[in-house]
Amino acid sequence: MSESTKLSLSTTVAQYRKLEAVGDRKAIGQFFVERFDERYFRPVEDSSSKHGFAVLAVACLVIETLESFYQGRLDTKNASTQMFQDFLARDTPLKVLAGENDWFYKDIRCGILHQSESRGGWRVLRSGPLLDAQAKALNATAILRALRSEVLLYAQKIQTDEQLWKNFCKKMGAVCGNC
């Protein structure tokens, strides 16, 4: 493990560990948002050649990663389906993506990440409502926007919720250990 590894543009492993040691949850929340912004949101938002499939692929990474922080999982090996079920069961605007037979996980997440296609007749758009179930259409931009809000909300929650804070520290211990 390298203490000099950058976890985000402004935070190394060593700097993160110091923040955790002194319990600076506000600064850690800011670091968390910065990390997600740099790694997930900005690369697809700043691109001049946005494509809904790439945006949804990133959204799926965010869902699984964010849920792993909520649960304090060291990794999500053999648990991806459960991560999506649990995240989509949360009271968020993305709850509309939950449903029978794990359609979002199977037709969108697995379709895009494994086959570079949506399945089940689903269309991926960059405008319109987040979900149009009747037309079988998803707005990738709206999904990513909702996820950005969820990351901000999570960063606020870890400042006051003891269990989430413990889970966050557990997950970040694994992240730092992988550096």
Question: Where would I find each of the regions flagged by the language model?
Answer:
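Amphipathic, Lys/Arg-enriched alpha-helical patches that create a basic surface
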Residues: 126-179
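A structural signal for well-ordered alpha-helical segments within the folded catalytic domains
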Residues: 57-60, 64, 82, 103, ...
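Short, contiguous, well-structured surface segments enriched in hydrophobic/aromatic residues
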Residues: 27-89
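Alpha-helix capping at helix-to-loop junctions
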Residues: 68, 93, 114-118, 153, ...
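Surface/interface-facing alpha-helical segments and adjacent flexible terminal/loop regions used
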Residues: 1-35, 42
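Anionic, Ser/Thr-rich low-complexity intrinsically disordered regions
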Residues: 12, 71-74, 79, 97, ...
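Histidine-centered, metal-coordinating catalytic motifs and their short helical/loop contexts
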Residues: 98-124
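Helix-adjacent hinge/juxtasegments
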Residues: 90-97
